[in-house]
């Protein structure tokens, strides 16, 4: 049955590992076509230490940061260690937004994605979406505080300022919490783009009682 094939196709596409490695390799190969960001060039310090959540070698190749000063906390291209997913128990997909009148003019209503899926009448479509959500939930990554600690210990890092750029601050809370506990008197600079990221940062600051934060809109 062609309708059953919808569900079967979802099951086939459950393994994203190969796609992730291919995506990361292509992104790394494209670095030769990317120009340095002016603001980042001002922010980055060649003597600083960097925790990047990026798989690619952007810092090394575009901004000439020595590789010894960089920790790829989620893995890096060229190594068999790429991680994808959410911290366990922290799966928070975006809400589903739809036009209540179906005329393209609103009003627009937000609902939890799983609530929307449960309301789909078509069995095949509902089952396919449920399979996809379940697979997304299964993609979780372990927090590697041990890697972060070893990196900081090895480099004997004495940190006075912590700069956060290009991170949504919606996940990876444990890393920020560890840094705040280890360097409790450090000055924090959060570069944010948009209201949602700013809200995430404010929550992060409040939850971790960060003493000296500064939020900079870009």
Regions found by a protein language model. Name each.
Residues 121-146, 209-218:
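Extended charged low-complexity segments that act as oligomerization/scaffolding linkers
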Residues 21-23, 53, 91, 139, ...:
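Phenylalanine-focused residue identity feature
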Residues 28-39, 136-154:
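A Trp-anchored, charged/polar loop motif used as the substrate-binding/catalytic surface
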Residues 1-128:
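Extended, H/D-rich, highly charged conserved domains that either
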Residues 5, 56, 62-64, 135-148, ...:
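Proteins with a high burden of low-complexity, intrinsically disordered sequence enriched in S/T/G/P/A and R
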Residues 21-22, 41-46, 133-135, 159-164:
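N-terminal start-of-chain detector that recognizes signal peptides
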Residues 144-218:
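SIR2/sirtuin-family catalytic core signature
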């Amino acid at each position: 049955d062609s309708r059953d094939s919808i569900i079967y196709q979802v099951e086939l596409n459950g393994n994203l590992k190969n796609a992730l490695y291919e995506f990361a390799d292509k992104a790394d190969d494209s670095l030769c076509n990317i120009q340095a960001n002016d603001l980042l060039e001002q922010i980055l310090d060649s003597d600083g230490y960097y925790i990047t959540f990026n798989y690619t070698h952007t810092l090394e190749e575009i901004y000439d940061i020595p590789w010894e000063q960089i920790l790829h906390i989620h893995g890096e291209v060229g190594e068999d260690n790429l991680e994808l997913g959410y911290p366990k128990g922290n799966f928070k997909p975006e809400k589903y937004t739809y036009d209540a009148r179906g005329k393209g003019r609103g009003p627009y209503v937000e609902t939890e994605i799983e609530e929307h899926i449960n309301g789909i009448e078509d069995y095949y479509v509902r089952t396919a979406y449920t399979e996809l959500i379940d697979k997304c939930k299964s993609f979780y990554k372990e927090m590697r505080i041990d890697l972060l600690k070893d990196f900081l210990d090895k480099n004997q890092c004495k940190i006075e300022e912590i700069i956060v750029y290009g991170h949504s601050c919606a996940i990876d809370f444990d890393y920020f919490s560890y840094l705040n506990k280890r360097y409790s008197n450090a000055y924090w600079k959060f570069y944010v783009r948009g209201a949602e990221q700013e809200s995430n940062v404010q929550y992060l600051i409040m939850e971790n009682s960060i003493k000296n934060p500064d939020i900079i809109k870009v």
